[in-house]
Amino acid sequence: MKLNFLVTTVALLVAFPPPYECRAIDSSSNQPATDPDGERQSAPVLARLGEEYFIRLGNRYQNSLRSSPDTYPETSQYPKRALQLQLTQRLLEGKVGNVGRWDGNYALRALDSEERERRSEEPPISLDLTFHLLREVLEMARAEQLAQQAHSNRKMMEIFGK
């Protein structure tokens, strides 16, 4: 088991080597005295919404993503990435609704609010129902497993004594 883990770890490190700038975030001793761009690299943003996603702001992987530094200006990437983070969070929370409303069309906003009201009155769609049923089945299986474990523990206590 340990050997499999070691081999897998080595294979992943060989396949995906860590970036050149792999160092502690807030360590003042590891940072160079002068930054070539005059900017500090920003810290990773951890958004936990169901699963953990790391969205990195800044130019940590600049060498691996672009061949030349003049392809995209760095200042225009921050607002785009911030907007992407915000939209991703809203999509994962289910608060966006109709994505087309972001174009500034106010008629779509009115239609979207009417659609939300109508949707709240309707029964849940099949996908929601499927996940609800799956959640209930998993809870029942967990309860059954706990009951079996308790029964097994009682038998062991009877056999070995208290």
Curated annotation (Swiss-Prot):
Q: Which Pfam families match?
A: CRF
Q: Where in the cell is it found?
A: Secreted
Q: Quick one: signal sequence residues? A: 1-24
Highest taxon above the source species: Eukaryota
Q: Does the keyword Transport apply?
A: no
What PROSITE patterns has UniProt attached to this entry? Answer: CRF
Q: What is its main location?
A: secreted
Q: Name one GO molecular function term.
A: hormone activity
Asked if the record carries the keyword Signal, the reply is yes
**Where are the Phenylalanine amide modifications?**
160
GO CC annotations on file: extracellular region
Residues of the propeptide region, as annotated, are 25-119
Q: Which UniProt keywords apply?
A: Amidation, Cleavage on pair of basic residues, Hormone, Secreted, Signal
PANTHER family assigned = CORTICOLIBERIN, CORTICOLIBERIN/UROCORTIN
Q: So what does this one do?
A: This hormone from hypothalamus regulates the release of corticotropin from pituitary gland.
Q: Which family does it belong to?
A: Belongs to the sauvagine/corticotropin-releasing factor/urotensin I family.
Q: Can you say what this protein is called? A: Corticoliberin-1
Could you tell me which species this protein originates from? Catostomus commersonii (White sucker)
Originating gene: crf1
